[in-house]
Design a protein with these regions (language model features):
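Conserved beta-strand/loop scaffold segments within soluble protein domains that form the structured core
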Residues: 8, 12-19, 23-26, 31-203
């Protein structure tokens, strides 16, 4: 709620074939240590992304998700915005070999939000991402998705953006294996004079 995790609004984070942790709770010995910030750092070349670097250094929370087997239902990250607030969130998703997951994101999260999502897809893995941004006239958002897609892995992401004063969505994909695939799509709808939207994709 307003960029702060709410246990009251969340389901139990334990589930079969899924390991979910919060960035705010983990220590140095967590599996994410070897992955956190790796793709963001690589994504600074050939174009600097200072907001992404700021996020990696300053993120207060985020979801650390490791998919280890069959997942029967999607994972939802829901943002609830009640009061003026700022949020810096960093998510990390690792999908193991031949595993698949669908991740849903919905809600404005905060008045000003900076998010990074790093997605590691092992051989034959599949990741489907559907995101709804809005409907919030006062939102300022900078989002970044970085993904490493290995052999025969599939990455799909769709974003629907409604309103917002300023929205910038970046997607940086590395196709690092044969016969891998990536599909990125989106739609934007703005109502009002103060509306600026920008999508950028690097492969």
């Amino acid at each position: 709620c307003d960029g702060v995790f709410s246990s009251e609004l969340s389901d139990d984070l334990t589930s079969e074939n899924i390991e979910i942790s919060r960035l705010a709770d983990v220590g140095d010995l967590h599996w994410a240590q070897n992955y956190y910030g790796v793709l963001e750092e690589k994504g600074q070349n050939p174009v600097n992304r200072p907001l992404a670097a700021f996020n990696t250094a300053m993120a207060s929370d985020g979801a650390l998700i490791n998919i280890k087997g069959e997942v029967k239902r999607p994972i939802l990250i829901l943002g609830v915005h009640n009061n003026p607030a700022e949020a810096v969130l960093h998510h990390l998703i690792k999908v193991d070999k031949d595993c698949s997951v669908t991740l849903l994101e919905s809600g404005p999260f905060a008045t000003r939000v900076n998010t990074v999502m790093e997605v590691f897809l092992e051989q034959g893995a599949s990741f489907e991402h559907v995101r709804a941004q809005g409907r919030d006239h006062d939102r300022w958002a900078a989002t970044h998705i970085f993904s490493d897609i290995k052999e025969k892995a599939k990455f799909k992401s769709f974003t629907l953006t409604a309103n917002g004063i300023l929205t910038r969505n970046e997607c940086v994909l590395t196709l690092s294996g044969n016969n891998c695939a990536a599909l990125v799509a989106g739609a934007s709808v703005g109502d009002g004079k103060k509306f600026h939207h920008d999508d950028t994709i690097f492969i």
